[in-house]
Design a protein with these regions (language model features):
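Hydrophobic residues in alpha-helical segments
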Residues: 117, 156-159, 216
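Noncatalytic regulatory segments and standalone regulatory/sensor domains
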Residues: 186-232
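A glycine-rich, coil/turn loop motif that links secondary-structure elements
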Residues: 85, 125-129, 155
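Mid-length scaffold segments of soluble, non-membrane domains
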Residues: 119-148
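Active-site-adjacent substructure of cysteine-protease-like catalytic cores
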Residues: 148-192
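A structural signal for well-ordered alpha-helical scaffolds and beta->alpha junctions
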Residues: 92, 128-132, 220
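Active-site-adjacent structural segments surrounding the nucleophilic cysteine of cysteine proteases
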Residues: 1-124
Length: 232
């Protein structure tokens, strides 16, 4: 039973699958996440203990990646709500990476950060990850100055004014079933680098947030929300 009614560059596009990324505004998407955030269940006994025990399995890899978490798919032994970090932890990973980029330290442990988002930010017990605005609230609560927008035309200015960024996007602007992903963007010598978006994604330079959106996931991604973070 097909639901395709047009093509994009030779690709069949399903009206049903593309409806949310194509037709629903970013602000409405953020509002939906906020509603689910407020309705969230917050009691996940045992997760912090298991995560503290298992995080040591990843320390060598983090060291090899210059202090960043890059290989989310390896985190099948750490939990966020009722899911694993490998399934739904990208927002927390992006936050962890951004704070490390800004401070050069891991003062907040990754398991403790997961625990904090389980108390405020988790959506559908982890099935939908973390509400994007909860990331900004977390950063503010930990003393970071932020600027944010869901309007693409404002992104490059935010990129220029920020020291690190966190971008939430649809993996596929034509297929909501390919889910949402959140990445940390770091800056060096007026170039932008993305973290935790596939094998050694941090090695490829970009030249603006617009450039990232044009090229990431072969141009198939679509923005939802950008947070810029400014060093204290």
């Amino acid at each position: 039973m097909g639901n395709s009614d047009h093509k994009s560059e030779g690709r069949e596009v399903s009206f049903f699958r593309s409806f949310i990324p194509q037709k629903i505004s970013n602000e409405k998407t953020l509002t939906f996440f906020e509603l689910l955030r407020k309705m969230a269940f917050h009691n996940f006994p045992g997760n912090l203990e298991k995560n503290n025990a298992n995080f040591k399995n990843h320390l060598k890899e983090i060291e090899e990646n210059n202090g960043y978490i890059e290989e989310q798919h390896n985190y099948t032994d750490m939990y966020y709500g009722n899911k694993t970090i490998s399934f739904c932890g990208c927002e927390i990973i992006a936050t962890y990476n951004a704070i490390y980029d800004l401070t050069g330290k891991h003062d907040i442990s990754f398991p403790e950060m997961i625990n904090e988002f389980e108390k405020d930010g988790i959506v559908l017990s982890g099935f939908f990850g973390t509400a994007p605005r909860a990331i900004e609230d977390y950063l503010k609560n930990h003393g970071f100055k932020t600027i944010s927008s869901s309007k693409k035309e404002e992104y490059d200015k935010i990129g220029e004014e920020s020291d690190a960024l966190i971008l939430t996007l649809y993996n596929d602007k034509y297929d909501i079933f390919n889910m949402v992903h959140t990445i940390n963007i770091t800056k060096k010598d007026n170039k932008y680098y993305i973290h935790n978006n596939g094998y050694k994604s941090y090695l490829e330079p970009y030249y603006s947030i617009t450039d990232i959106l044009l090229r990431i996931n072969d141009g198939e991604a679509k923005d939802i929300f950008l947070i810029g973070i400014i060093k204290n």
